[in-house]
Swiss-Prot record:
Name of the featured protein: Integrator complex subunit 11
Transmembrane segments: none
Subunit comment: Component of the Integrator complex, composed of core subunits INTS1, INTS2, INTS3, INTS4, INTS5, INTS6, INTS7, INTS8, INTS9/RC74, INTS10, INTS11/CPSF3L, INTS12, INTS13, INTS14 and INTS15. The core complex associates with protein phosphatase 2A subunits PPP2CA and PPP2R1A, to form the Integrator-PP2A (INTAC) complex. INTS11 is part of the RNA endonuclease subcomplex, composed of INTS4, INTS9, INTS11 and inositol hexakisphosphate (InsP6). Interacts with WDR73; interaction is required for the assembly of the RNA endonuclease subcomplex in the cytoplasm.
Cofactor: Zn(2+)
Means of activity regulation: The RNA endonuclease activity is inhibited by BRAT1 that forms hyrogen bond and hydrophobic interactions with the active site.
Motif HXHXDH motif boundaries: 68-73
This enzyme's EC code(s): 3.1.27.-
Family of the protein in this entry: Belongs to the metallo-beta-lactamase superfamily. RNA-metabolizing metallo-beta-lactamase-like family. INTS11 subfamily.
Pfam families: Beta-Casp, IntS11_C, Lactamase_B_6, RMMBL
């Protein structure tokens, strides 16, 4: 029996190093190839030895798909392709292709140049890896080979993020990557059609969360920032370079303008310019409001937000700083945090999810004494706030997407086990869909049924059986019945019943051909000549001369008309249905040869 096999190499009951191996109808696809931000050893990368035991990666894998540019989804890609060894195609969207190498290089600099880590990929490896990338457009069906095809859908989340449908014959899997079902200030909501895959693999980061009103969260965020700077404190907002950063910058920019505030706002050097460049380049990926106003005003060119210099961190007085990365695991955000953590007037606002092992996760879990590098202990006196501006779907959004796609089964990844368990039960009870949540290295096998049960109406069955007993008709019947699909159930009914159920009127499509004849007689006389001629030739057909002057041969209609510009010429209009195309073509050819001379 056909089956789909899924093995998470990363993100199984876990957030970080997303990497899911899918086998579908004899094809093997790797979905994402991320790194875990909470580890600095071999655990940061997925365990690729699971694949390589039986030979070369390229021989086993048909393709790799990257859903978006976040490092927990693409961070291990150069290691995988250049160090482990994979030469096959890597698919991603155009914005992901543009932004991915920049973030990989930024992270490489932190890991190798600053921390001196060994066994890490080089700048050249990033370039060589990106040469294997095939960029895809949204809703474009891409043939990976003769049997395997993939298609990208808009996922929201970050610029260029996509959900992917993987299809082989009648079997299909949809992988969501990270997505957001709520539009925000710069991106639209995720969308997928009713594609009814055998399996939907969905993220479950916020599996138990139902978010409050976005407007309340924004108001709360602005209030906390404003109160902190009013009392002379500094606000650190750790973000990733693209995504929540732009969302919160637009929010603060508007508030600063409205309140006429003079407190400086800074953003990590260089990244603002890069972000601006890519949002301009890929403006079709943003939401409708930004696309409409972009010609008059670029929402990403900020009047109040300036580039940050590391010397500014020691300046007296209030300020707001957006610094990367978003989980306080390295880089500029961690450096600033260490400087400001000891002052209770200051505040750090964590706007997104932090994986276990990162400083961000530790302070959100309540730790206030942190062991840093070199066994230094950092005491955190600054206020710590968590405000979810995360661009992940909440429980309501995940349920909405499952309902939209109508899969046969659901598999949860990219989430914590306890939260997954809650969502698994919710999906199974409310949507009556089987749901799985494998751990890393655990394989889920799903049998797929290539047959679809179809109900048939008794009336149609009786009619077809009676038709089968009759001698073969001259003309083949083009339509025996109509397949109706409703609520995932299929029924075969007669075409008359289908029209009645759907409230549709029957239409007939006819083809008309013009035949020119030289004839000075009146139209009625020409039609009579046509009737006599055809009656004498077509002994086995029903030829009739109707009261209105037209001629019929079976269902074929022939009418004579006189063009006003040439009274000596008559035009015969020969029309037929698709069913009688053969007879219609024959009559047209016959009439084009002309009519026999009538006795004078």
């Amino acid at each position: 029996m056909p089956e789909i096999r899924v093995t998470p190499l990363g993100a199984g009951q876990d957030v970080g190093r997303s990497c899911i191996l899918v086998s579908i109808a004899g094809k093997n696809v790797m979905l994402d190839c991320g790194m875990h931000m909470g580890f600095n050893d071999d655990r940061r990368f997925p365990d690729f030895s699971y694949i390589t035991q039986n030979g070369r990666l390229t021989d086993f894998l048909d393709c790799v798909i990257i859903s978006h540019f976040h490092l927990d989804h693409c961070g291990a890609l150069p290691y995988f392709s250049e160090m482990v060894g994979y030469d096959g195609p890597i698919y991603m969207t155009h914005p992901t292709q543009a932004i991915c190498p920049i973030l990989l290089e930024d992270y490489r600099k932190i890991a190798v140049d600053k921390k001196g880590e060994a066994n890490f990929f080089t700048s050249q490896m990033i370039k060589d890896c990106m040469k294997k990338v095939v960029a895809v457009h949204l809703h474009q069906t891409v043939q990976v080979d003769d049997e395997l095809e993939i298609k990208a859908y808009y996922a929201g989340h970050v610029l260029g993020a996509a959900m992917f449908q993987i299809k082989v014959g009648s079997e299909s899997v949809v992988y969501t990557g990270d997505y957001n079902m709520t539009p925000d200030r710069h991106l639209g909501a995720a969308w997928i059609d009713k594609c009814r895959p055998n399996l939907l693999i969905t993220e479950s980061t916020y599996a138990t969360t139902i978010r409050d009103s976005k407007r309340c969260r924004e108001r709360d965020f602005l209030k906390k920032v404003h109160e902190t700077v009013e009392r002379g404190g500094k606000v650190l907002i750790p973000v990733f370079a693209l995504g929540r950063a732009q969302e919160l910058c637009i929010l603060l920019e508007t508030f600063w303008e409205r309140m006429n505030l003079k407190v400086p706002i800074y953003f990590s050097t260089g990244l603002t310019e890069k972000a601006n460049h890519y949002y301009k380049l890929f403006i079709p990926w943003t939401n409708q409001k930004i696309r409409k106003t972009f010609v008059q005003r670029n929402m990403f060119e900020f009047k109040h937000i300036k580039a940050f210099d590391r010397a500014f961190a020691d300046n007296p007085g209030p300020m707001v700083v957006f610094a990367t990365p978003g989980m306080l695991h390295a880089g500029q955000s961690l450096q600033i945090f260490r400087k400001w953590a000891g002052n209770e007037k200051n505040m750090v606002i964590m706007p997104g999810y932090c994986v276990q092992g990162t400083v961000g996760h530790k302070i959100l879990s309540g730790q206030r004494k942190l062991e840093m590098e070199g066994r230094q202990v950092l005491e955190v006196k600054m206020q710590v706030e968590y405000m979810s501006f995360s661009a992940h779907a909440d429980a309501k959004g995940i349920m909405q997407l499952v309902g939209q796609a109508e899969p046969e089964s659901v598999l949860l990844v990219h989430g914590e086990a306890k939260k997954m368990e809650f969502l698994k039960q919710k999906i199974e009870q409310e949507l009556r869909v089987s749901c799985y949540m494998p751990a890393n290295g655990e394989t889920v096998t799903l049998p797929t049924s290539p047959s679809i049960p179809v109900g048939i109406s008794l009336g149609l069955l009786k009619r077809e059986m009676a038709q089968g007993l009759l001698p073969e008709a001259k003309k083949p019947r083009l339509l025996h019945g109509t397949l109706i699909m409703k609520d995932s159930n299929f029924r075969l009914v007669s075409s008359e019943q289908a029209l009645k159920e759907l409230g549709l009127a029957e239409h007939q499509l006819r083809f008309t051909c013009r035949v020119h004849l030289h004839d000075t007689r009146k139209e009625q006389e020409t039609a009579l000549r046509v009737y006599s001629h055809l009656k004498s030739i077509l002994k086995d057909h029903c030829v009739q001369h109707l009261p209105d002057g037209s001629v019929t041969v079976e269902s074929i209609l022939i009418q004579a008309a006189a063009p006003s510009e040439d009274p000596g010429t008559k035009v015969l209009l020969v029309s037929w249905t698709y069913q009688d195309e053969e007879l219609g073509s024959f009559l047209t050819s016959l009439l084009k040869k002309g009519l026999p001379q009538a006795p004078s």
